[in-house]
C-alpha cells in the first residue's frame, strides 16, 4: 500500500494541475513537497515510477487511480491551448507526457495503467464547473467492484470503457461532497430506450458514494413493478450480499427464494466492506418494500460522526461514515413519508451530501400539442422540490430515454428540477438494436432494389392491416412467428453449443391499449387463438413451414451473425414441440401485466425464473420496464398522438444471437381515437425517431468547445427543442425559458424545414413564389450519378438563382410555425449580406418513370410531385431522399469531389444548393393522379438546402441565443 505522504503529494500536484494544464512533474512535486515535511523522498519521477510498477492491479492502487482519472480528463479536453492534437488520440497523450516532462519508461507504465480510450465518449452540454473528482480523497471501493462484475458478466473492455467515461462525466459535474459551501448541481442524462441506463446510474452511484455521497435516493418509476426491478438490480450488482445480510442468516434475506441469490450471482466482497477497508451501504428499502415511515427506527437515517465537532461533510467524518441507499416509488404519499422522516433526524440536513437519481424523469407525456395539467406529476415534483430545499447538498440527476424530456417543454413543470448544470447524451451502445435497425433512414436503393439484406424494414417489420376488429389474421401470423423463433432459439442453443442460459427468456409483446378492460377482451382473444392454433397438428406445421420458407429462412440467411440457420423446415421441426411446451408450461402461455390482480394469469418476474410467454400490457410495459428476450412485438396502439411511441419502443434492446429473428408487427392504418382519420404507426414512429436523431446530432455539434468555452449551456437547450416541436405551449403561460434561439449557422450541412402551412391561402402564396423559379429551370433534366460503382443515378431539372433573390424568396415564405425557420433565416440573411455566397443551384428531382406529374396553375410545363405526409400534427416527416442529399453535399463542397462530371461542373466554392419537392398530401392525390392538374393551394412546396461549406462567420461558433430577461441569471423566468 502506498505511503500516505506519497498519496498526499500526488493529490496536491494533480489538484494544482486539474484546473489548468499538465506541467513539469519534477518541478511540481518539488514545489508541493516544500509544504509537506517528510515528502521530499517521494518527490521524484523515479519514486513515482517505482510506485506505479508495484501498484495493485486495476481494482486497487490510489496512485494509479488518481493519475488514470487525470490523464483521461486531459485526453478528453476539446481544443486546449497546450495541444493541437485531437482528443482521445495517441498524439494527445504524447503532448500530455511532453508537458509533464516524463521519461519513456514512466510513459510506458502510465499507458499500461491508463490506456488511451479511443472512443468518442458521451456528448456533454455543460456549464463550467470546478474540477475536483480526479483528486477526491474518498475510497475507490464500489466502482472498481462494479466494473469487475461487468467484466465477469461478459461486458467487453470497450463497453466498460464507454461506461467509465460516461459515469465519470456525470460525477465530475456534481459538487465536491467535502466542499464547505453547499452547491446543488442538477443534470440530465439522455440514453436510449432499453439501452442500459440502469447500468449507467448504478455506475454513477458507485462512483458518487466512493467520492463521499452518503445518502442516495433513487426515484424508481411510478409503478411497484419498476421500483422492485430497480431495487433488485442495485442490490445484486452494487450493494452486495454482506450489506444485504448485515450478519443475518442467508435464509432471512428478502432474496432467500431468488434463484440467483442461491446461485451466488449477487456481488460478494468476502466480508463487510467496512472490515476490508471500505465502507458499508445500509439499505432503507428492500426487494418488495418501498420506503415506509421509520418511527422508532428513525436512527437508520442518522449518520455517525467520528469527530462530533466537525460537520458530516468534513473528510474526517465523511469517509468513515456508511452510505444509505433507498429506491423509492415516485408517489406523493411515499415521498411525503420520506420528507416527514428527514425533518426528524438529528444530523443537520445541511451537512449531508445527497445524490438523487430520477429514473424515467420525463414520466409524463410531453409530445402533445395541448398538454393537460397532471396533478399527480405536479404533486411529485413538489415533493422533489421539497427534498431539494431541505437538502442543500443534494445533487439531482435525471435519466430519460428521449431528449424531448418534459423538463425542456414546460417551464412551469421544470422550475425546480431543470438540469441547469449539465446534459449528457449517451452514445448508442455497441450491440444495441434501436430505431435505425427497424427503419431505412438513409437507404439509397429504390423500392424495387430493396432486399432482406439491405432493408431493415423488409427484414424486421411486418404490416398489420385489418378489415375490422374480428380480423385475427395478422395476430395469428405474429404468434406463429413467435413459435418459430422459439424453435430457432432451441436449435441454436443445441447446434451452436450456446448452453441453456443463452436464451433464458423468449417473449412476445402485444400492445393495443392501456385500458384494463381492453386487456380482458384481448386476453380472451389471444388465449383462444393459442389453443386453436394446432401447433402439434399437420395443419399447424404446414402453416409454420410456409412462414419459415417465405419469411424466417430468407431473412436469417442474410442477417444471422455467427449463428446457425436450419437449411430447411425439416431441420427445425423437431424443436417446434419443445418450444410450444416451454411457452405453454403451467397451462398459461399468456401473462397480463397491468396491475389488475384478477387478470394476472402469471407473473412476469424475469429475475426469478425463465419466461417463455406472450405478454399483454399497457402502461406497465411502456415505461422503464425491461421485457427480457423480446423477439416478436404486435403493436396497434390507438391514440390521438404519437407521444408514447418513443417510450413504447420496447422492441429496442440487446438481442445477442437472435437479431435476425426480431419482428415488429405494427398497425399501418390505425384509426385515431377521434374522428375517422387514420395513422400509419410505423411512419409516425419513424418521424419521431428521425427528429430525435437530428436533435442528438445537434447536441453533438454544439458540444464542441469554442475558444475554451461551451457553445451552448443547458439553459439554451429548450429553444433547440422548440425547433423540433414549435407548436408546444407550456401549461402555465406566465412562465417561460429565459433564452431564445436567434441564429443557427449550418455551412455544408443539410437543413430540412418541416413546419409548412396548412391553410390553402398560405400554400398558394408559397407555391406562386416558387413557380417562376421552376419555370426558369433547364428544359431537359440532367442525370446525376450518386453511386458510380453501382451506376446509380437520378434525373433532376437544374437552374441557378442569385444569392439575394433566393434570400428574398426565403424571407417571403409562410410557415405554420415561423419560429422553426427564423434562426436559419437569420443565418441565410447573414451570409448573403456579408457576400459569403454568390448563388444557389436549384435542383428539382424528377421521377425515373413518367408518372406523378402535374401542371400547377397556368404553367405550361409539368413537374413531378412527391407523396409526403404530416407525421406530428402539422409537421412533416422526412421530405428529402438520401440520394438527392448526396449530390447537394458535393455541390456545396461538404464532401470533396464527386466522380460524376455533371455534379462537378456545378461545384464552386461559394455556391449553395436548394432541392425542391412539390408535395401532394393524401387528400389530394387522387385529383393529382387523375387530372394531372392541381390548384396551387393544394400543393406544399417543400425544400431542403445546403449552404456553402465555407459560408460562416463569428469564428467557430455555430449557434447564437438571446437572453429574454438579462437581469435574471436563471433558466426559467416569470413573464
Give the ranges of each region predicted by the language model:
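N-terminal accessory nucleic-acid engagement/regulatory domains that precede
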Residues: 5-141
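C-terminal accessory/interaction regions of large nucleic acid-associated machines
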Residues: 638-659, 796-975
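Pre-P-loop entry segment of helicase/translocase ATPase cores
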Residues: 116-181
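C-terminal catalytic or substrate-handling cores of phosphate/nucleotide-
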Residues: 309, 329-330, 464-501, 505-517, ...
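Walker A/P-loop
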Residues: 183-201
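Conserved C-terminal RecA-like helicase domain
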Residues: 249, 253-305, 340-363, 371-373, ...
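Conserved P-loop NTPase catalytic core
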Residues: 245-267, 352-358, 362, 367-497, ...
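Conserved RecA-like P-loop NTPase helicase motor core
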Residues: 590-673, 679-680
